[in-house]
Structures are given as C-alpha cells and as structure tokens.
Design a protein with these regions (language model features):
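A glycosyltransferase accessory/donor-loop signature
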Residues: 2-6, 10-17, 51, 161-318
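A conserved hydrophobic helix/loop-capping motif in glycosyltransferases and polysaccharide synthases
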Residues: 19-26
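Short amphipathic alpha-helical segment that frequently serves as the phosphate-/nucleotide-binding helix
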Residues: 30-38
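Short, acidic, metal-binding catalytic loop of nucleotide-sugar glycosyltransferases
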Residues: 39-47
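Short internal beta-strands
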Residues: 49-55
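Active-site-proximal specificity loops/subdomain of glycosyltransferases
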Residues: 58-100
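GT-A fold catalytic core of metal-dependent nucleotide-sugar glycosyltransferases
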Residues: 91-146
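Conserved catalytic core of nucleotide-sugar-dependent glycosyltransferases
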Residues: 124-192
Length: 318
C-alpha cells in the first residue's frame, strides 16, 4: 500500500472593507445617499459601497441609476425603523451592527459629500488597529459638573444617576455621522449595551437637554455604552486644537474655512443638522461641485443639496 502525502496550504483571507450608508424616510434621504455615493465613486473608484434602505424598490424608483455608483443594496426591517408607527432614526442607528455587510465598515451619514479620494482615510482607520472609532469632540467625568458642553443631549448628573454610572467613568461625546466599525466582540458589545439602554432604560424625552426631531438620539446611548466599556472612540487623542479627528469630515455651523482649505485637509464636507444649520456658503459650493461633476459625464445634478437640507429629521420634518 502506497502512502500518499498531502500538503496543506494556508491562505490568509483579506477582511472585507467598505462604506455603509443608511437611507430611509423621505425621498430626500435617497437623494442624499445617491449624491454621496456618486461623489465617493468619482474620487474612489475601488471603494465598495453598500446602501441600506427601508424600501429598496421605492428608493431605486427615485434614483434609478444608483446601482452605477454602488456595489450592493440592503433592506432595513421596518421594526427597526418605526416606534409606534413613528419614524425613529435613533433606533435604526443603535441597530446598525446587525446590518453591517463588511468585516471593516466605514459608516457615514448620507448628509455629506466626498471632496477627494477617501481610500487614505480608510487606510488610516484600518492601520489604527481599533475596532470602533467615531468623530469624538470631547470627554467628561462627573467631577467636572453637570454641564457636559460637548454633549448636548442630556445633563451629566442626569446621565450618571439614571444609568447608575461609576464616578470613575470617562464619557466621550461622539458625532455618529462617522463610525468605523470592525465586526467582532468589542463592537458587538458596544452596540448590545447601547441597544439595551435605548430600549429598556431610556431617559424620557421630556427630560432630555436637547430634542432630536422628537425622538431619542443614538449618540446619547452610544456615549454611555462607550463609557461603560471603557472604550475611547477617538482615532487620535482628543485635544481642543484637534476636534476634527485629523481632518476627516468638515462640520461647520458658521462660515470659516475656504473651499481650498477643506479639500486640502478633509475628505468629506458635511451638511449635517437641520435647515440652515450648515452655512449656505458650503451648501451652494457642494451643489456647484456636483453640477460640474455630473456635467462632465453628460448628466445633470438633479438632487440639489439645497433642497435636501430643507427636509432634515433634525427639524422634525422627516
């Protein structure tokens, strides 16, 4: 009997990486996803993009050529979108983990436009070695008092008492418009805790320091979950001079940086917040830029940012 030798070759599998967008509610959010996907594809042709919709058929009827700019679409279950028949965006975002299609996910709110190649941004996030990163604008400990200036959703003493937090906890303040999520035990635990707090122990809306379109803000519960798990969500150590996370997304409440400054130092320009929150200076710039980019490929810029910005959930109009 001849002995047959076998050799086993071990191949490393490269983790999948891509951008994840959420679009639900009014058609304007489909339009926003379309514009953002188009801008990413223009600057970063090899980056994978998945858009998660409440109603993919309806969404594609509004943006019929969207599939030219994305790789995949997904469907969000209605029970993760509505509470008592009312749209609940915070609920969608605390449920985000179970919908993530990649091993390494760059989640972006759709109210932004890429102004250059985002692959270096993804590379930097990957090389950080961290499993969860968000745009971090500050930290708070309860000994600093009740006013957590960087986190407008609730007073610090209210959060510490309501959630029975330890005095030693350090709470971050994130802007969840950008989240880097590596699937695994750490990220899963963060979202599991945030969901549990959101559904089973929420601060009553009437007691919130600031309202968000009549619903619960996901950032509040993500901040508490991060504090409980002792996780710093910042890409780099936060300082007062660098709250922009190393220049990834430009958020503006007033006119400041020039267009050149933004394109040199940031990857995306956001138009977050309600109508009038982001200065018209930047809104008009984005529309001009998109109009030129669409014209270059023989198309028209149909879904104007100026119109989308008038229909944001933050105003309770969604």
């Amino acid at each position: 009997m001849n002995e047959q030798s076998t050799s086993t070759t071990t191949q490393s599998i490269t983790p999948s990486t891509g951008v994840v967008l959420l679009a639900f509610g009014k058609p304007q959010y489909y339009w926003a996803a379309y514009n953002l996907a188009f801008s990413i594809r223009k600057h970063s042709p090899n980056v994978k993009i998945t858009v998660l919709f409440d109603d993919p058929i309806k969404a594609l009827s509004h943006c019929h050529d969207l599939m030219q700019y994305i790789n995949h679409i997904g469907h969000i279950a209605l029970e993760d979108i509505y509470t008592n028949k009312k749209l609940d965006p915070g609920k969608v975002k605390v449920n985000l983990y179970k919908y993530l299609p990649y091993d390494r996910n760059l989640y972006l709110d759709v109210d932004a436009i890429a102004v250059k190649d985002i692959q270096p941004m993804i590379d930097e996030l990957t090389q950080s070695g961290k499993d969860y990163i968000s745009h971090c604008v500050g930290y708070h400990t309860i000994d600093k008092g009740r006013d957590f200036k960087e986190m407008q959703w609730a007073w610090a003493d209210k959060m510490w008492a309501h959630f029975n937090l330890l005095e030693s906890y350090v709470m971050p303040a994130i802007n969840s418009s950008m989240q880097w999520i590596v699937k695994g035990s750490q990220a899963e635990a963060i979202y599991r805790t945030a969901k549990d707090l959101y559904f089973n122990n929420p601060i009553p809306i009437k007691d919130l320091r600031m309202k968000w379109g009549g619903g619960q803000p996901d950032e509040l519960y993500m901040n508490v979950a991060l504090a409980i798990h002792g996780i710093d969500p910042a890409l780099k150590a936060y300082t007062k001079n660098d709250s922009s996370e190393g220049g990834m997304i430009h958020f503006a409440m007033q006119r400041g940086l020039s267009f050149q400054d933004i394109t040199e130092n940031y990857y995306l320009q956001s138009y977050y917040g309600g109508a009038g929150f982001t200065p018209r200076f930047y809104i008009d710039w984005l529309d001009r830029m998109l109009a030129a980019d669409f014209k270059a490929i023989g198309k028209r810029h149909i879904y104007l940012i100026s119109r989308i910005a008038q229909n944001k959930y933050a105003d309770g109009k969604r």
